[in-house]
């Protein structure tokens, strides 16, 4: 074999090995033809801008070659604490060229996102009293960490009814990335916000509230809207001097997504404490995002009797088979539930000054978000340190938490 031929084979192998991966770990909820492209960490801002210009030229060239009416191309671009990525809709030829680009780490399909809760009925409200007492025997709420003064809460959800009386004029509309209805026409976002920051139903009773709408009236959105929401929140907090003094509740889910997990972690690194729902499929949270994201605080739902709610996802405390199988993709799936919080029959705010009961890890997560805000403000902790502190304070009282899963229940450290 000639030296030239050997060199050609070598470079062909090198090119294949170093090409970016197209991650299609799970096809459920995939939006056809829509993608998220994530750059390598070493890529500079100038290189990213150059890549975007290259992408636009490549997309136009391939459209002309195929004589196709398909024209969407580049969507949003993001830089979240150095995590650079973009969304868009591209033909197969363009996707292949993106995968072969030296600065691209991976590409994955855009997927649907939706609320992570189920609605139930009843006539009970008990969550606040439970998280403020070590023993499950009291019906009052006690807090020695204040009421969230100087904390800002960002709710990424179906929007928030900023005129809800329980928010006492502290809420403002941030951005609508879902539709043309600048209010919460689903109710999920207002309910979770009430548990975080309502005057009667919430923990951060004096915090500022910001609505980021990424889900429509039916509770559906997608990954692109989600990352747009994260990016907007980081920029807003930065402009207003709120980094290190903000919290975010994410009671949403999609099938496992490396892009969602990475963007969520980087958003917390930028300066916002983040609590995420484990999900309501009664299975391992490792199969869903952002519940499988490392470093952020993943929350399971507990009942009034301190058991794992029947619907709540759980999480293994070590390397799972899925983590081994998908290790080469770089997907972080060995991080799941950090602690539990009340998530069954939780009463909170709804649009139009109504209240209602909901159940789900969506309802548990706002409790952690709220207590996290109190701890961060009072103890001066960095956002990425808050979850560890919450786990230190938590009580090991959850019965039957799930296979190899923590038994820790959220506690606000009141001393009661």
Curated annotation (Swiss-Prot):
User: Which part of the chain is the Peptidase S8 domain?
Assistant: 125-416
Taxonomic superkingdom:
Eukaryota
Propeptide ranges are: 20-116
Instruction: Name a Pfam family for this protein.
Output: Inhibitor_I9
Please provide, alphabetically and separated by semicolons, the GO molecular function terms listed in this UniProt record: serine-type endopeptidase activity
Signal peptide extent: 1-19
What is the protein name stated in its UniProt record? Subtilisin-like protease 12
- Gene expressing this chain: SUB12
């Amino acid at each position: 074999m000639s030296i030239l031929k050997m060199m050609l084979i070598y470079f062909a192998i090198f090119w294949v090995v170093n090409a970016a991966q197209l991650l299609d770990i799970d096809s459920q909820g995939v939006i056809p033809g829509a993608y998220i492209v994530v750059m390598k960490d070493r890529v500079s801002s100038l290189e990213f801008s150059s890549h975007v210009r290259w992408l636009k030229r490549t997309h136009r060239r391939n459209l002309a070659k195929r004589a196709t009416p398909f024209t969407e191309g580049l969507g949003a671009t993001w830089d979240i604490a150095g995590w650079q990525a973009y969304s868009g809709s591209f033909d197969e030829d363009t996707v292949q060229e993106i995968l072969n680009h030296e600065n691209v780490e991976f590409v994955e399909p855009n997927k649907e996102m939706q609320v992570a809760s189920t609605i139930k009925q009843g006539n009970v409200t008990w969550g606040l009293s439970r998280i403020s007492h070590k023993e499950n025997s009291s019906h009052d709420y006690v807090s020695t960490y204040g009421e969230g003064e100087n904390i800002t809460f960002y709710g990424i959800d179906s929007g928030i009814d900023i005129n809800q009386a329980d928010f006492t004029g502290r809420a403002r509309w941030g951005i609508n990335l879902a539709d043309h209805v600048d209010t919460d026409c689903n109710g999920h976002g207002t309910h979770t916000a009430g548990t975080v920051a309502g005057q009667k139903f919430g923990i951060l009773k004096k915090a500022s509230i910001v609505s980021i709408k990424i889900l429509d009236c039916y509770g559906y959105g997608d990954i692109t809207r989600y990352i747009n929401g994260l990016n907007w929140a980081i920029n807003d907090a930065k402009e207003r001097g709120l980094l290190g003094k903000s919290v975010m509740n994410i009671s949403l889910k999609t099938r496992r997504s490396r892009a969602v997990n990475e963007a969520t972690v980087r958003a917390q690194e930028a300066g916002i404490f983040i609590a995420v729902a484990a999900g309501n499929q009664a299975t391992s949270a490792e199969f869903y995002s952002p519940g499988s994201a490392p470093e952020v605080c993943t929350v399971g739902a507990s009942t009034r009797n301190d058991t794992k709610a029947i619907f709540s996802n759980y999480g293994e405390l070590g390397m799972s088979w899925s983590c081994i199988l998908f290790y080469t993709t770089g997907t972080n799936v060995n991080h799941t539930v950090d602690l539990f919080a009340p998530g069954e029959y939780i009463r909170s705010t709804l649009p139009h000054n109504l209240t209602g009961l909901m159940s789900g890890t969506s309802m548990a997560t706002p409790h952690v978000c709220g207590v996290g805000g109190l701890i961060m403000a009072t103890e001066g902790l960095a956002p990425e340190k808050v979850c560890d502190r919450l786990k230190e304070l938590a009580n090991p009282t959850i019965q039957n938490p799930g296979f190899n899963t923590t038994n820790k229940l959220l506690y606000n450290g009141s001393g009661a």
